[in-house]
């Protein structure tokens, strides 16, 4: 359990309804300072509502929430001085350059980061003088992140940070997020990419129908929920063995194959993933 002094976010029995529809039905979790925390769930689960409450953009109906020791419902302006937000879609001026955009946002903060340092951190040094409208989709997301970081935030909210990225750009973004974590920045991540959450998050919470149905480290969730699968082909048929003891099962299979003179064709040992766990918890997601 994380000690109280080490918590960047504390949420207890948080509720929010829109008319007769309950978006959040008493969720509780804590985020430690300096960790990457992932909030996962299908569309309509309540993720956006929860994040907007924590950012100070939406009022809760009940329960308690503190972010960096502040109540986001009563101290939103003070809170926004200390957090950075990367929205899924942003509206930055297309006619400003990358450098001008960073300098403009730096002017909103009392103690901003050095603009050139931020531009280098997000990998846009060569695009410093390029206009926003000329940037690729991945470069615009890097600009969004730079704008979120220029105020020296203690906590950064990342909403679908790599949507639309090609594989190389996604990996580069992951390394950037890891570098932020190494600097002590707390990161609150929402993503539909389960491999991204597994790679980056120290802990995750799975939200469904306004309730948190599971939370913990990705390794803990995987260990609690899934077994390892061993697949091979024998006599033209695919055989799948599910086991909690893969070493023992594989040894028995190979010994049997050696004794009978059979080959374990197309042998594959498939470890469970966070995506497997997620789909078991919430089912197939539909858009």
Write out the residue ranges for each language-model feature.
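Actinobacteria-biased recognition of intrinsically disordered, low-complexity terminal regions
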Residues: 1-5
